[in-house]
């Protein structure tokens, strides 16, 4: 190991548009010597990595890129492992810590590498912002990818979210090899929700290829051409309604307050 202490940053680059990347994420990427990531994610920061050592990986090579990032940091390099959205939500930081735990990494040891998760704007944040206010009350997040989690476990989680009347954000709704999962999920929700429950389908949020559809649960499958790994689906709950093409999930103020007042009873303090 180098005498210089290496640093490993697991960086969330957000939905893909630099306007929605955090200042710290940009700063860390710019000061890093080595950039590692899935090829599509690396391409999102192409203009920030000129002249750097860059390693691009294909999908399903997560373990390889995580190990390489750790290896470079252990050699004293400053490394950014880039992840779309937020690295702590279906991202790479969990795998990094799993590997480090197996290696016996001690974060308090001054000779150990420095590791930091740099948060980013997740799909659930970016997609919700594009379609109104769908996440105002309790919500659940479920990934349809059964590559690492058995489908029967995913079904149990979907059932629990549907039965609990949670607004539900669905990541990875479909791929070339996964076509039945969202159809099955829709059937589960229809057991507990009305067919006209609002849903949103957002593909490529804040990217040039962005597509948005706000529709209803019973018509979800009419938009299967939008489904893929960069698509997020938001399923409303029993309170969600559609207004002007937006999903609105009431926070509960209507039951406690008069929302439109003829005259404000108490004036705010002016500073």
Regions found by a protein language model. Give the residues of each.
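A generic local secondary-structure boundary/capping motif
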Residues: 1, 70, 115, 130-131, ...
């Amino acid at each position: 190991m180098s005498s210089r202490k290496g640093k490993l940053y697991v960086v969330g680059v957000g939905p893909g548009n630099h306007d929605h990347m955090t200042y710290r994420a940009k700063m860390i990427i710019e000061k890093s010597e080595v950039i590692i990531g899935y090829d599509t994610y690396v391409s999102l920061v192409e203009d920030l990595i000129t002249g750097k050592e860059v390693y691009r990986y294909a999908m399903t090579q997560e373990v390889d890129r995580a190990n390489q990032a750790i290896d470079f940091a252990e050699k004293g390099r400053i490394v950014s492992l880039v992840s779309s959205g937020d690295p702590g939500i279906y991202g790479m930081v969990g795998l990094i810590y799993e590997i480090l735990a197996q290696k016996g990494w001690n974060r308090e040891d001054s000779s150990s590498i420095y590791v930091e998760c740099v948060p980013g704007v997740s799909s659930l944040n970016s997609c919700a912002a594009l379609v109104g206010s769908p996440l105002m009350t309790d919500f659940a997040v479920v990934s349809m990818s059964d590559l690492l989690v058995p489908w029967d476990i995913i079904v149990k989680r979907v059932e629990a979210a549907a039965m609990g009347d949670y607004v539900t954000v669905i990541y990875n709704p479909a791929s070339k090899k996964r076509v039945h999962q969202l159809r099955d999920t829709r059937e589960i929700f229809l057991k507990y929700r009305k067919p006209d429950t609002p849903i949103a389908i957002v593909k490529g949020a804040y990217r040039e290829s962005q597509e948005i559809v706000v529709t209803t649960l019973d018509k979800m499958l009419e938009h299967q051409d939008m489904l893929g790994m960069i698509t997020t689906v938001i399923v409303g709950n029993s309170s969600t309604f559609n207004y002007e093409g937006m999903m609105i999930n009431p926070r509960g103020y209507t039951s406690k307050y008069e929302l439109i007042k003829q005259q404000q009873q108490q004036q705010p303090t002016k500073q």
